[in-house]
Amino acid sequence: VHDVPVPKGGGVPVFLGSVAAMMVFLPLDGHLIAIILAGLLLVSVGVWDDASDISPILRLLVNFLAAGIVIGAGIGIAYITNPFGSGVIHLNQPQLSFNFLGEQRSIWLLADLLALLWIPFMINAVNWSSGLDGQIAGVVPIAAATIGILSFRFSADVTQWPVAIAAFSLAGAFLGYLPYSFYPQKSMPGYGGAGYAGFMLAVLAILSTTKVGTAMVVLGVPLIDAVYVGVSRI
């Protein structure tokens, strides 16, 4: 509870800062365009929600739409580590192939479905854990930097460099916002900032070789809190 009104638009500068860094250091390919568009959608709806308190159902639909944008760009959970032994479990089957505008396309049903569930879950998990001053601005840089550092372990794999750069861009944006988030807060990240943070961490976990397991370990406390909140509200 705040004694004086506190603006909730902190997600806007965080979004602009991270996107500016990514556009400077990364090629503007299909993945990055989809991430920017989905992030812009989440932040815009978040600002709208903070101002007008829109329907939770509409917010959830927007979460799935944001997930659908990046999935449509080819971002999906192609495999997961086998919890019952060594190796991985591939999720690239079954596939639904079709012709679109003269090009052969395919949908990996399991991979895309898992991503469609994982991304909205992370968006809401991070948002539900944003109740304390400085919590989001402190947790997100740690999680993003961890993904970035682990991506550097595979520096010989050139596909991991963009993941590391995007992760450090997100971490830097939230670190820059951190002084304004300490008690007493001068600004709140709001639904837009928290939703964008959860979205980016979910996507980075998918794109990195560490996959979702790393995000679940780094964000263990917020994820457990999210499950508790979800169960308590049923």
Q: What is the predicted function of each stretch?
A:
Residues S232-I234:
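Juxtamembrane non-transmembrane "cap" segments at the membrane-aqueous interface
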Residues V1-V229:
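"…together with the soluble PPM/PP2C metallo-phosphatase catalytic core" -> "…together
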